[in-house]
From Swiss-Prot:
It is an enzyme of class 2 (transferase). It comes from Nitrosomonas europaea (strain ATCC 19718 / CIP 103999 / KCTC 2705 / NBRC 14298). Its main location: cytoplasm. This is Shikimate kinase. The keyword Kinase applies. The gene is aroK. One of its GO terms (cellular component) is cytosol.
């Protein structure tokens, strides 16, 4: 079964550049991490504060296909979904001045990891599995978590994906239990620091979490 595609890019509301907290953060900001790590919540707030456009790749896939993620998994399987995800990702990263929230499994393909690093500053939102479970265990829109033991599945996925997130990221931030606004303010500081170090050193640094 093939879903319809609509290639008009979906945008968030016009960025709030008047009250922007950007200082100087050029280019795209790409958020990676496990499901439940806060990519969408953080991404929307960050985009508003730094005057960029927010795009959620899962929402874009659903908009283009006209169906929810669980339906794609049911009909095409995870492999079919990953193929669509990669296609949409290639389209989106060509956009300028965006904050992109990726899907949790977007980093599974090596080409995707290279693409993300090439087209923006990649930020890994890292949260403990216990916190991920608290945020996701009632969510029926996550096909990989429709299992009898959500905690065990999250451990399995985290074990598989954490090294790939770390390999891909320029910045790693702990997105555990703190307010979204406090987290985003810390992230903006890290992004400014990262940009300064990139300018001086000529290559993106990997900033490890200090708290």
């Amino acid at each position: 079964m093939h879903f319809r595609y609509n290639y008009r890019m979906q945008r968030s509301k016009t960025p709030n550049t008047k009250n922007s907290d950007t200082g100087s953060i050029p280019g795209n900001i790409i958020l990676i991490g496990m499901m439940g790590s806060g990519k969408t919540t953080v991404g929307k707030l960050l985009a508003n504060l730094v005057g960029k456009t927010f795009i959620d790749i899962d929402h874009e896939i659903q908009r283009r296909t006209g169906v929810g993620i669980p339906v794609i998994f049911e009909i095409e399987g995870e492999a079919g979904f990953r193929k669509r995800e990669s296609e949409v990702l290639r389209d989106i990263v060509r956009q300028q001045n965006i904050v992109l929230a990726t899907g949790g499994g977007a980093i599974l393909h090596p080409d995707n990891r290279a693409l993300l690093r090439q087209h923006g500053t990649v930020v890994y939102l890292c949260a403990p599995v216990t916190e991920l479970r608290r945020r996701t265990y009632l969510d029926k829109n996550r096909p990989l978590l429709q299992t009898g033991n959500v905690h065990a599945k999250l451990i399995e996925l985290f074990t598989q994906r954490d090294p790939l997130y770390r390999e891909t990221a320029h910045i790693i931030m702990d997105s555990g239990r703190q307010s979204a606004r406090a987290f985003v303010q810390k992230l903006i500081q890290k992004l400014r620091q990262s940009n300064q170090e990139f300018t001086a050193a000529g290559s993106p640094p990997c900033v490890k979490p200090s708290e």
